[in-house]
């Protein structure tokens, strides 16, 4: 049980996939202008990350390794991610049509979000990660992505009404803010011993 908590905390804070491993930067910068949109995408991405991590483990364990097809891992994982994203898109459209319209093109673009493929590949490469550990790591990666995305969106909303010098407006102040957030998350680096 302690190991599962360490995997979860490690994925959320210590090895945050956005601020420490620099995966998922496209939606991080692109969807963080409004907090409502950021929350919606964060929830959808967390769901996709968790489900894709578990499905990728099953594909790796019960299809690719027994049939000696490990060279098809990346293509297989992309296929699994595409199916999970389509399922998520149908679920969001059915449960919240407003959120579906607000997210627009960003929902199907979760398929190309490198954090989803990165988590699946890292889970496959980690020796000793079983089905539950892969799911917990995917869920933790989703929570870490959500935490960072929502915090960044809240800061960008505040920055939008602030008096920012002209050379720093737009992407420049966004990248500076992301860099400061990354420095703050580096403070968690010694929290869990490898």
Swiss-Prot record:
Quaternary structure annotation from Swiss-Prot or TrEMBL: The complex is composed of six subunits: RnfA, RnfB, RnfC, RnfD, RnfE and RnfG.
GO biological process, one term: electron transport chain
Gene: rnfA
GO cellular component terms, semicolon-separated: plasma membrane
Electron transport as UniProt keyword: yes
Family: Belongs to the NqrDE/RnfAE family.
Primary location: membrane
Bilayer topology term: Multi-pass membrane protein
Pfam families named among the record's database cross-references: Rnf-Nqr (PF02508)
Cross-referenced InterPro entries: Ion_transpt_RnfA/RsxA, NqrDE/RnfAE, NqrDE/RnfAE_oxidrdctase
Keywords tagged on the record: Cell inner membrane, Cell membrane, Electron transport, Membrane, Translocase, Transmembrane, Transmembrane helix, Transport
Annotated TM spans: 4-24, 39-59, 72-92, 102-122, 135-155, 172-192
Its EC number(s): 7.-.-.-
Superkingdom of source: Bacteria
Enzyme class name: translocase
Record's subcellular location: Cell inner membrane
HAMAP family according to UniProt: RsxA_RnfA
Protein name per Swiss-Prot or TrEMBL: Ion-translocating oxidoreductase complex subunit A
Task performed by this protein: Part of a membrane-bound complex that couples electron transfer with translocation of ions across the membrane.
């Amino acid at each position: 049980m302690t190991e599962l908590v360490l995997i979860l905390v490690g994925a959320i804070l210590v090895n945050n996939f956005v601020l420490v491993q620099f995966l998922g930067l496209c939606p991080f910068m692109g969807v963080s202008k409004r907090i409502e949109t950021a929350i919606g995408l964060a929830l959808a991405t967390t769901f996709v990350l968790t489900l894709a991590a578990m499905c990728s483990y099953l594909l790796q364990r019960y299809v690719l390794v027994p049939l000696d097809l490990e060279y098809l891992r990346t293509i297989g994982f992309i296929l699994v991610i595409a199916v999970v994203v389509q399922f998520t898109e149908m679920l969001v459209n059915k449960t919240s049509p407003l959120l579906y319209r607000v997210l627009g093109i960003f929902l199907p673009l979760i398929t190309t979000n490198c954090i989803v493929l990165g988590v699946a590949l890292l889970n496959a490469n980690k020796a000793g990660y079983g089905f539950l550990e892969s799911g917990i790591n995917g869920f933790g990666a989703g929570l870490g992505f959500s935490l960072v995305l929502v915090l960044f969106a809240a800061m960008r909303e505040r920055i939008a009404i602030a008096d920012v010098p002209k050379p720093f407006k737009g992407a420049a102040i966004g990248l500076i803010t992301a860099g400061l957030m990354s420095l703050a998350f580096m403070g968690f680096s010694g929290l869990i011993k490898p």
